[in-house]
Design a protein with these regions (language model features):
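Active-site beta-strand->loop->alpha-helix modules in alpha/beta enzyme cores, enriched
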Residues: 1-106
């Protein structure tokens, strides 16, 4: 079965919390899962923590769910400023659709 699940999450951890069980189940059933977060929310990370902690955590969490490392994509759109980047985000979604041709999108 060569089917692809595409998960679109505004921020890291939104996809895992929102549909982590589904991601895991689809992967167990032979699907490829591509996980995309549009922001690592680095501006919101507390100063005493590594600035890339959320990026590291999403890689670990998605790996636990069965997402291949190369299929965990984190863009650098600034948190709380998505409306300013509306066109760029839309362009990225179009590129993702063309590249992965997903069967299901969450």
């Amino acid at each position: 079965m060569n089917k692809t699940l595409l998960v679109l999450a505004p921020h890291t951890d939104d996809g895992e919390f929102g549909c982590g069980g589904c991601i895991s189940k689809f992967v167990q059933n032979g699907w490829r899962a591509v996980y995309v977060a549009f922001s690592a929310a680095e501006q919101s990370v507390l100063p005493h923590l590594p600035h890339d902690i959320l990026r590291t955590e999403v890689k670990e969490a998605t790996a636990t769910l069965g997402v291949a490392d190369e299929d965990c994509i984190v863009f650098d759109f600034e948190v709380r400023r998505f409306p300013e980047f509306r066109q760029q985000i839309l362009d990225r979604m179009i590129e993702l659709n063309r590249k992965y041709a997903p069967d299901i999108v969450f």
